[in-house]
From Swiss-Prot:
Compositional bias segments (type: Basic residues): 855-871
Domain of life assignment: Bacteria
Protein species of origin: Thermotoga neapolitana (strain ATCC 49049 / DSM 4359 / NBRC 107923 / NS-E)
Entry-linked Pfam families: P-loop_SecA (PF21090), SecA_DEAD (PF07517), SecA_PP_bind (PF01043), SecA_SW (PF07516)
Sequence similarity: Belongs to the SecA family.
Recorded GO MF terms: ATP binding; protein-exporting ATPase activity
InterPro entries registered for this protein in UniProt: Helicase_ATP-bd (IPR014001), Helicase_C-like (IPR001650), P-loop_NTPase (IPR027417), SecA (IPR000185), SecA_CS (IPR020937), SecA_DEAD (IPR011115), SecA_motor_DEAD (IPR014018), SecA_preprotein_X-link_dom (IPR011130)
Its membrane topology: Peripheral membrane protein
Location of region: Disordered: 852-871
Stated name of the protein: Protein translocase subunit SecA
Signal peptide residue numbers: none
């Protein structure tokens, strides 16, 4: 009850704002087109912040309403204006199917776009992004805003006037799609001013991705906005970034994107280009290395460290001058992995070999983990060691969940037909209240109580009977199934009965919208998986309202009431008649797992015969309570995963901020000074802070740096501070020497090296984190809190990674030397490989790669043609 009281209070406040907007209606109608354009320019001058937007809401909303009337022949209803206010306030607007969410969004989109930081309108597929941008484009264009569209094929567009000179004429001569004399609520197509409608036509013009984001409004899918963010944080030049920040987003189908897919990680990955022969080659090379002479083993960290002798041996065997050259980094990793496979990972302890496959053994339970693989090329190294077929390695370069991506926005809003049941989660995770917007016309759909059968066989037979009955009288039927498999089963049963029907599975393509739109025609039977066709209205064909409207049949209850409500909501749009009914069985997953035995007992007591259902409001209530219980369980799972993700999110921000700092910096002296201080300071503190100094241990701990850097030559130091000063000055002198030696290219080289080092360490860290995430879940059995354990481990791991990044940067910048002109060609070839590898970072999948291949510009040189790194 409290929810509805609160909702009523919010709607009462909105009604007062709508009244003020309505009061401006007549004055807006009297304005000429030129005055409308001019008022929009004035508002743009006035609105520079969110506070300014709040102050100018009434005038801006009234202006958009008038622009929509003139360009589209559509006037947002009062309830749509209410929805727009909720969206402007950063809430989730629950608006039923067919209530015009797309038009409602134009008002808050326009108002917030005036601030000039860019507004993102997020849809669930490319088709809807393109459709909505073209459909609403004329409103924004008349008001002087630029509209961009991005899609998953790497293409980007701007919405532009089809005939700018005709638009100019239409503005000058005051053309309007909505005739001045028409005072009705809804303008029918035949009543529209065709001359104006023709003038205000728009089309798409291809532009760059960056330009699409520079537009005032950008339409796109949740996937693409997320992927562009990840790709932006893999660039080697700041100017290659396409997004300009995360200011305000309106998410369509918010429940689907922000809750159902909240934990879905967006992953930029690519198959490794390594051939199996590389792994086999290094498996052989590793056998030639002698433990404690060529390498040492750190059992605790489960890693291998090459000695100076080992590095020299590797360079000789592999046939390279310098193992530390940027282009040779992968060779070093191959060697380390081969040595780890040979000396650290034991057959029948860490893994077993079965049917030509290397299968990991769970270290906690001793069980086999088929399908699970070691990351970073280690699994392939073990396969090479064991002589079994080597499977392709997949490399993760960057990842983020939708939850964490959308929480970056300064202001976030959502709209959907079903959100009320998830308000608790919207509030706790995103800080967004849900406002239920009333329908423009009263809802008259008839929702029947659930029918429960003993078996699935009985249930499906009755569903087919029900479909046949309604098909014979011409009433359209939409059947919602929970899986593709179930939709195909039902389809084959209907074929046997000779009932024509269309099947729609949840694979988004443009044809889907056509199928869904046809579902309301007389005699049409459509089978669809629950999520298919969201965003497209089912309009009733001629004579269908008299037959009772669209009949929606649910074939089982979903774990979430919201998904069931979405299915019901396909019928009864905009006050149309309609029906909904769910057919269930005790064998359905939900009832079988969560309490179907209670219903089974009732059926036995009532002596329900085979093929006969049980139907009662109390039963529907019982099923709803089961769903509430499951929703609670699922929410708590998502919440605990979110707490783990928050740790990773902060770490991601740290890494991406560090990248930005490096990309924007022109001189790296100050940054490198901090790194040297850290590298020297931590070692001096560890080995020489007390009375017992371990100078040999100190030298060994710095052995990854050039060897001749720290020769003490019998020097004595009075304090650890003096020792620190000496070591730091030696490093700094060496750095300055290198800097002068290389000259003006040095900064460019250092930037490239540092970014590569950070990206590589972060990539490997992400893989390690996934292993920790899996491992801590098992510790719950030992009465340990997985979240506390995860936080503890990842904090330590992150600190360790940052230390390794600093060590590696110090190592590389002190080894850079200028190469002679004769080596230039060879060095450029190495660079070509690096650049291609980095381009791989920017690609999501093969299809996208092919689409981008044609128009791809050649990447410019990173200025590394004359550089190599020397040991």
């Amino acid at each position: 009850m409290l929810f509805f009281d609160k909702n009523k209070r919010i709607l009462k406040r909105y009604s007062k704002i709508v009244e003020k907007i309505n009061q401006l209606d007549q004055s807006m109608r009297k304005k000429s087109n030129e005055e409308i354009v001019s008022l929009s320019s004035e508002l743009k001058e006035r609105v520079n912040s969110l506070e300014d937007a709040d102050r100018n809401l009434v005038e801006a909303f009234a202006l958009v309403r008038e622009a929509a009337r003139r360009t589209l022949g559509m006037r947002p209803f009062d309830v749509q204006v209410m929805g727009g206010i909720a969206l402007h306030e950063g809430k989730v607007a629950e608006m039923k199917t067919g209530e015009g969410k797309t038009l409602a969004a134009t008002m808050p989109v326009y108002l917030n776009a005036l601030i000039g930081k860019g507004v993102h309108v997020v849809t669930v597929n490319d088709y809807l992004a393109r459709r909505d941008a073209l459909w609403m484009g004329p409103v924004y264009l008349l008001l002087g805003l630029r509209v961009g569209v991005i899609n998953s094929l790497g293409k980007s567009y701007e919405v532009v006037w089809k005939d700018p000179s005709l638009v100019e004429k239409a503005i000058k001569e005051n053309w309007s799609v909505w005739p001045q004399e028409f005072d009705g609520e809804i303008l029918k197509e035949e009543q529209m001013n065709k001359e104006a409608l023709n003038a205000f036509q728009v089309e798409l013009k291809e532009i760059s991705r960056k330009e699409a984001y520079m537009c005032d409004v950008t339409y796109g899918t949740n996937n693409e906005f997320g992927f562009d963010y990840l790709r932006d944080n893999l660039v080697l030049d700041y100017n290659d970034k396409v997004q300009r920040g995360h200011f305000y987003a309106i998410v369509d189908e918010a429940d689907s994107v922000l809750i159902d897919e909240a934990r879905t990680p967006l992953i930029i990955s690519g198959p490794s280009k390594e051939s199996p022969s590389t792994y086999r080659r290094f498996a052989q090379i590793a056998k030639k290395f002698v433990k404690d002479k060529d390498f040492t083993i750190d059992e605790k960290a489960r890693t291998v460290i090459l000695t100076e002798e080992g590095v020299a041996k590797a360079e000789k065997i592999i046939g390279v001058d310098n193992l530390y050259e940027p282009g040779n980094v992968s060779l070093l990793y191959h060697l380390i992995n081969a040595l780890k496979a040979l000396h650290l990972f034991k057959k029948d302890v860490d893994y077993v070999v079965m049917n030509g496959e290397v299968i990991i053994v769970d270290e906690f339970t001793g069980r086999l983990l088929p399908g699970r693989r070691y990351s970073g090329g280690l699994h392939q190294a073990i396969e090479a060691k064991e002589g079994v077929p080597i499977k392709e390695e997949s490399i993760t370069y960057a990842t983020i969940t939708f939850q964490n991506y959308f929480r970056m926005y300064e202001k976030l809003a959502g709209m959907t037909g079903t959100a009320k049941t998830e308000e608790n989660e919207f509030v706790q995770v995103y800080g967004m209240e849900v406002v239920v917007i009333p329908t423009h016309r009263p809802m008259i759909r008839k929702d029947h109580d659930d029918l429960v059968f003993r078996t699935q066989k009985e249930k499906y037979e009755k569903i087919v009977e029900e479909i046949e009955k309604r098909y014979k009288k011409g009433q359209p039927v939409l059947v919602g199934t929970t899986s593709i498999e179930k939709s195909e089963l039902l389809s084959s049963m209907l074929k046997k009965k000779g009932i024509p029907h269309q099947v729609l599975n949840a694979k988004h393509h443009e044809k889907e919208a056509e199928i869904v739109a046809k579902a309301g025609q007389k005699g049409m039977v459509t089978i669809a998986t629950n999520m298919a066709g969201r965003g497209t209205d089912i309009k009733l064909g001629p004579g269908v309202a008299e037959l009772g409207g669209l009949c929606v049949i649910g074939t089982e209850r979903h774990e979430s009431r919201r998904i069931d409500n979405q299915l019901r909501g396909r019928a009864g749009r905009q006050g149309d008649p309609g029906e909904s009914i769910f057919f269930l069985s005790l064998e359905d997953d939900l009832l079988r797992i969560f309490g179907g035995e209670q219903i089974g007992k009732v059926m036995k007591i009532l002596k329900i015969e085979e093929g006969q259902p049980i139907q009662h409001p109390m039963l529907s209530k019982l099923i709803e309570n089961i769903q509430k219980k499951v929703e609670g369980i699922n929410f708590s799972i998502r919440k605990s995963l979110m707490e783990m993700d928050e740790v990773l999110d902060k770490q991601r921000s740290t890494i991406y901020s560090l990248r930005d700092q490096i990309l924007l910096e022109k001189d790296y002296d100050e940054y490198l000074k901090q790194i040297f201080e850290d590298v020297i300071g931590t070692r001096v503190e560890e080995f020489c802070s007390g009375k017992n100094w371990d100078l040999e241990g100190l030298k060994n701990s710095l052995s990854f740096l050039p060897r001749d850097l720290f020769e003490f030559d019998g020097r004595r130091f009075e304090s650890s501070e003096e020792l620190y000063e000496y070591l730091f000055n030696r490093m700094w002198e060496e750095y300055q020497k290198k800097r002068q030696e290389i000259g003006e290219e040095y900064s460019k080289v250092i930037r490239f090296l540092m970014l590569r080092i950070i990206d590589e360490h972060w990539r490997r860290y992400l893989e390690e984190v996934e292993h920790v995430r899996e491992a801590v879940q098992l510790r719950a059995y030992g009465q340990k809190d997985p979240i506390v354990e995860f936080k503890k481990e990842t904090y330590l791991m992150f600190d360790e990674m940052m230390r390794r990044i600093n060590d590696t940067i110090a190592n590389y910048v002190l080894r850079v030397v200028k190469v002679t002109e004769k080596d230039e060609k060879e060095a450029k070839e190495e660079l070509g490989k690096i650049r291609l590898v980095h381009e791989e970072f920017n690609l999501v999948n093969r299809a996208m790669r092919r689409a981008m291949e044609k128009g791809k510009k050649k990447g410019g040189s990173h200025g590394l043609g004359k550089i190599r790194v020397k040991r």
